[in-house]
Regions:
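S-adenosyl-L-methionine-dependent methyltransferase catalytic module, highlighting the catalytic core
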Residues: 107-162
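Flexible loop residues that form catalytic
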Residues: 65, 101, 129
Length: 162
């Protein structure tokens, strides 16, 4: 195998390991959110449609910007913007699980979404791509890097496109 082939194989293995790690994290966090919702006799709101059903389960309600039946075959689909979630769920408190959603928002949009969620959530669990993944960097739809600060708050770092 020539040098280019070795480099390509290394990149594929590197990204594959990260994707498996993220898959495991999504499953674990989703299962925890589901258990918290069940324990509290609350609805689970999944934000970010589980595309093709591979990454995590559905919620009692599932919110996505676009309802595409090829991707999102779930009970109670809701098409809408995460920043308006407090207007959609005024009548109840929910446990929130969002998967690979927050990075699609600018820092100001992300803060707006978290503020809306804080009005309806009993508990919230969020996952997003790791900053070390290649797919996280090359996605043209990612607008920020969410992370957790020392106080446990979610913060957003603007993406630079250089």
């Amino acid at each position: 195998m020539d040098m280019l082939g070795l480099i390509l194989a290394g990149v594929i293995v590197y990204e594959g390991c990260w994707q498996l790690s993220e898959h495991r994290e999504r499953k674990q966090v989703y299962n925890h959110a589901r258990a918290v919702a069940d324990f509290n006799n609350a609805s689970l709101l999944v934000i970010g449609c589980p595309k093709w059903g591979l990454w995590h389960g559905h919620g009692d309600y599932t919110l996505d910007l676009i309802h595409d039946p090829r991707w999102c075959v779930c009970p109670n689909p809701i098409t809408g913007d995460i920043r308006d979630v407090d207007k959609m769920f005024m009548w109840k408190s929910v446990v929130v699980f969002s998967s690979h959603v927050l990075e699609h928002l600018t820092p100001s949009e992300g803060q707006e979404a978290l503020n809306a969620l804080s009005k309806i959530e009993l508990a919230a669990y969020h996952v997003w791509p790791n900053k070390k993944t290649i797919s996280g960097w090359v996605s043209p739809w990612h607008k920020s890097w969410p992370s957790v600060d020392n106080d446990g708050d979610i913060i957003f770092e603007a993406r630079s496109r250089q």
